[in-house]
């Protein structure tokens, strides 16, 4: 084998000195760099390391965009950054380059652990960031990892302790912080939030707060998004006190410009809710040579529209993507859509942010977005990196005026399009025929109807989304249904709670129910025979219980007008279960029963008391007199004192609760680490006790004959115990010259085998 060339000690010292000098020069360049005077055009003009420049050049990133030119120098100087720029302006490189440079300046190694954390709201965006990082960090000696839902958690746990740059979604990152023993965030240098406004909203609030509580406050924080939040409460949660606001949307010149790309042509059409699918199908039929994304409000709608349009064959490839799909299917769909030229993708907002699809011609928003920020992110999937693109928004007459006013407030004024009647085609008869033939499609249509109605109900902007004015019967007929299905709508609080649970990791929910040792009580699994499975089998498609509940007829409603309804049919009564109706036989018993009734009736309702320091009882809720109340001051003063007192108490209790939760989490991790250590020690003890060193006795001089006896036992029953080798000049005389037997250890590697062969040949 060819030996690796190793540097001498002197050369190693020289190399380290050169690296130290280059790093000092680079740090001086960063201090002297002024973005206003030094108008950098390419990445090579920036004070960054040669490895980063080389990686950017090989990945074809030469010239900088406006957000990169503004954000990278500020981040290199160690400031916290709040970055905002239009969609498709290159925000990913604006935070990945400072991440690499930060760890390079700190001379980060694998032994230092986690140095940078990048949080993304969606799995697809996290995968895209990871791919870009691998490209530009090719010549840097850092390890990077991706942790997202839908992947093997145990596989990630084994490797997460050796990662320097970790990219992931909030739920999976929090799960690793709670479960992975090797993940240590106490030495974190930089935190990045991509699409920060989405990460800071209610859906990820608890997960993000828990993640930030595990991070050191001395870190550098970078926040990037196309629609940035400057709420003081949100920034305080991330410990952003002294930060710099950068971006193309910051400054006096940008105040009169919209937040959408300049090359994006924006249109809208007024269409009634029952006519939306007709217009959508007609639009797809007239744009067969285009690449388009169609946004719908729920995964059920995406599934229904995809299945029905696929059967009607509009003449273009159709794909669908939503959050309820498996991760492998989502990744495969993203890859196919990126490589396709003429294709239509039906999707929810799971790809509305950050995802870079090449050459998207049209973005169609079939359902009205919940706010202007969502509109900007959806429309931003087209016209990226200076290319042209078009956006089409469908608005109902109830939504038109209010939502256009919201858009005008952000300087966005889409042009109105009129639909040609010759291009319009009704697909309602085809949908009715499909639903009549296929009960599963009918089930999907009912679920799509229910999910759309619920999505309108939970919207906060009631001026745009008018729930009471929805034409439900006409909308159901447009989906091919004979009538509007029953919709059970819970309160908004329960819906928001369900939405919050949707973004929470299932493993984290299980871990929350764990005991102090971190163990989750699992139900004992009973053995099910094939007969149990056969009798307990249910149809999971058409005749499922959920399907029957939705499609049940109105027979039950016919009896609703009856005055009395049957709750239970006639059944036999067990006499043993009936109570005794006889009175007490003795006079004493009768008197006792009567006295109890009399005493209870005279006592009245029970009351509870609390005792003061002197032992005097007082009712729990005791009202003060008017004079006593006014002695303490006026109402406003007392309210302020009470609020300040309670606020101080809640803040103190909140700090104590956070500290307690942190200590419990650390204790759980410590116990798991201790259990792993004991397990490793037990395995080592077993190896020391049973695994004696294997010895091969070579006496023939023919290595192939001696090593071929692999089927024979390793130890002969009468073999002598291994002898200790003698050192010095007596080592040769220790071997017996008469027998010609030489004692050696069994070769483990190829190098050991080569050295053993050379010794045997030399005799």
Curated annotation (Swiss-Prot):
InterPro entries referenced in this protein's UniProt entry, alphabetically: DEAD/DEAH_box_helicase_dom, Helicase_ATP-bd, Helicase_C-like, P-loop_NTPase, RNA-helicase_DEAD-box_CS, RNA_helicase_DEAD_Q_motif, SPB4-like_CTE
Gene Ontology BP, a term: rRNA processing
Keywords of this entry: ATP-binding, Helicase, Hydrolase, Nucleotide-binding, Nucleus, Ribosome biogenesis, RNA-binding, rRNA processing
EC numbers on record: 3.6.4.13
Main location: nucleus
Record's compositionally biased regions (Polar residues): 577-587
Region (Disordered), start-end ranges: 574-613, 681-763
Catalytic reaction annotation: ATP + H2O = ADP + phosphate + H(+)
The organism's place on the tree of life at top rank: Eukaryota
Subcellular location: Nucleus, Nucleolus
Cross-referenced PROSITE patterns: DEAD_ATP_HELICASE, HELICASE_ATP_BIND_1, HELICASE_CTER, Q_MOTIF
Binding site for ATP: 85-92
Bias (Acidic residues): 682-691, 743-754
Leading EC class: hydrolase
Single annotated GO MF: RNA helicase activity
Residue ranges constituting the Helicase ATP-binding domain according to the UniProt record: 72-246
Reported function: ATP-dependent RNA helicase required for ribosome biogenesis. Involved in the release of U14 snoRNA in pre-ribosomal complexes. Required for pre-rRNA cleavage at site A2.
Family recorded in the similarity comment: Belongs to the DEAD box helicase family. DDX10/DBP4 subfamily.
Quaternary structure and partners: Interacts with the U3 and U14 snoRNAs. Associates with pre-ribosomal complexes.
Free-text note regarding domains: The Q motif is unique to and characteristic of the DEAD box family of RNA helicases and controls ATP binding and hydrolysis.
UniProt name for this protein: ATP-dependent RNA helicase DBP4
Originating species: Eremothecium gossypii (strain ATCC 10895 / CBS 109.51 / FGSC 9923 / NRRL Y-1056)
Upper classification of the organism: Eukaryota, Fungi, Dikarya, Ascomycota, Saccharomycotina
Gene: DBP4
């Amino acid at each position: 084998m060819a030996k690796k060339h190793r540097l001498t000690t002197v050369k190693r010292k020289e190399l380290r000195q050169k690296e130290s000098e280059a790093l000092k020069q680079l740090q001086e360049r960063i201090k002297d760099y002024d973005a206003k005077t030094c108008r950098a055009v390419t990445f090579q003009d920036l004070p960054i390391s040669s490895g980063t420049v080389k990686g950017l050049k090989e990945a074809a990133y030469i010239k900088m965009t406006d957000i990169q030119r503004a954000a990278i120098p500020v981040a290199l100087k160690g400031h916290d950054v709040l970055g905002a720029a239009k969609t498709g302006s290159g925000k990913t490189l604006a935070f990945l380059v400072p991440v690499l440079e930060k760890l390079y300046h700190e001379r980060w190694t694998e032994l230092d652990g986690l140095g940078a954390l990048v949080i993304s709201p969606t799995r697809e965006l996290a995968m895209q960031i990871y791919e870009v990082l691998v490209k530009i960090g090719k010549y840097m000696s850092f390890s990077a990892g991706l942790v997202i839902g839908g992947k093997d958690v145990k596989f990630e746990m084994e490797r997460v302790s050796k990662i320097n740059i970790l990219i992931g979604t909030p739920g999976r990152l929090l799960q690793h912080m709670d479960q992975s023993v090797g993940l240590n965030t106490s030495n974190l240098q930089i935190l990045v939030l991509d699409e920060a406004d989405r990460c800071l909203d209610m859906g990820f609030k608890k997960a993000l707060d828990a993640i930030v509580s595990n991070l050191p406050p001395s870190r550098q924080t970078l926040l990037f998004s196309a629609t940035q939040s400057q709420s003081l409460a949100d920034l305080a949660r991330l410990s952003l006190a002294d930060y710099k606001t950068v971006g193309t949307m910051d400054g006096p010149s940008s105040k009169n410009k919209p937040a959408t790309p300049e090359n994006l042509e924006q249109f809208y059409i007024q269409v009634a809710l029952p006519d939306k699918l007709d217009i959508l199908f007609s639009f797809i039929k007239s744009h067969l040579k285009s690449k388009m994304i169609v946004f719908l409000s729920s995964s059920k709608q995406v599934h229904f529209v995809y299945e029905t349009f696929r059967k009607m064959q509009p003449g273009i490839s159709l794909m669908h993507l939503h959050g309820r799909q498996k991760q492998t299917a989502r990744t495969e769909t993203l890859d196919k859509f990126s490589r396709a030229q003429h294709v239509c993708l039906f999707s929810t907002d799971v790809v509305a942010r950050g995802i870079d699809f090449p050459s998207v011609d049209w973005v169609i928003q079939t359902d009205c977005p919940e706010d202007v920020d969502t509109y900007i992110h959806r429309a931003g999937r087209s016209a990226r990196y200076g290319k042209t693109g078009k956006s089409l928004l469908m608005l109902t007459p109830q939504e038109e005026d209010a939502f256009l006013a919201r858009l005008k407030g952000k300087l966005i004024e889409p042009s109105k399009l009129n639909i040609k009647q010759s291009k319009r085609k009704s697909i309602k008869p085809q949908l009715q025929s499909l639903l009549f033939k296929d009960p599963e499609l009918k089930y999907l249509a009912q679920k799509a109807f229910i999910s759309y109605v619920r999505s309108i109900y939970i919207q906060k902007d009631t001026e745009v989304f008018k729930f009471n004015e929805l034409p439900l019967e006409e909308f159901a007929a447009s989906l091919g249904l004979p009538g509007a299905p029953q919709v059970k709508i819970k309160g908004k609080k329960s819906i928001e709670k369900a939405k919050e649970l949707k973004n929470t990791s299932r493993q984290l929910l299980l871990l929350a129910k764990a005991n102090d040792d971190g163990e989750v009580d699992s139900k004992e699994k009973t053995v099910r025979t094939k007969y149990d499975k056969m009798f307990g089998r249910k149809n999971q498609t058409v005749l499922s219980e959920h399907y029957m509940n939705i499609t049940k007829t109105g027979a039950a409603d016919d009896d609703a007008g009856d005055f009395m309804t049957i709750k239970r049919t006639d059944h036999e009564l067990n006499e043993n279960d009936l109570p005794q109706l006889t009175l007490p036989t003795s006079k004493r018993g009768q008197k006792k029963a009567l006295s109890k009734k009399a005493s209870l009736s005279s006592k009245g309702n029970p009351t509870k008391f609390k005792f003061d320091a002197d032992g005097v009882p007082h009712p729990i809720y005791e009202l003060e007199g008017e004079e006593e109340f006014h002695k303490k001051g006026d109402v406003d003063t007392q309210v302020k004192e009470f609020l300040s007192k309670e606020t101080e108490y809640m803040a103190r209790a909140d700090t104590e609760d956070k500290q307690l939760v942190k200590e419990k989490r650390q204790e759980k991790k410590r116990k798991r680490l201790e259990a792993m250590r004991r397990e490793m020690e037990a395995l080592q003890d077993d190896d020391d006790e049973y695994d004696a060193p294997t010895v091969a006795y070579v006496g023939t001089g023919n290595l192939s004959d001696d090593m071929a006896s692999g089927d024979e036992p390793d130890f002969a029953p009468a073999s002598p115990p291994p002898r200790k080798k003698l050192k010095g000049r007596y080592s040769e005389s220790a071997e017996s010259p008469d027998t010609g037997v030489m004692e050696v250890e069994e070769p483990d590697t190829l190098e050991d085998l080569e050295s053993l062969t050379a010794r045997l040949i030399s005799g």
